[in-house]
Amino acid sequence: MKRDLSLAGTAEEILRRSSDIIFSMIKDIAMKEPSPVEQTGEVTVFKRRRPEDGNLAPLKTTAEAYDYIRMLQAEGYPRAFVETDELRFEFEDAEVADDGVIAKVKIRNKFTKL
């Protein structure tokens, strides 16, 4: 049983859409009791993300930065960031613009409070 899922928007938006699909599938499974079908194809294994995986510094394109920012915007996920020696810049609400990406940024001092 497969359903299409749009990957547009933030991680939070994608998770909401996927939950709607999952609940619909649960209802179908309970009512129709389909026969299991063995999966085919190559197995893909993903490593668990760590907070430091959200660092934008190694990225090369604005498209990569946009995807990082939007995919790390969900409850429980640390935001995409860039750091200097003293400051941490955390990004959210990314939008593609004509000449790059526009996003909200929260700037934190890494070692002291305001």
Task: Give short role names for the model-derived ranges.
Residues M1-T112:
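Active-site-proximal loop/hinge segments within enzyme catalytic domains
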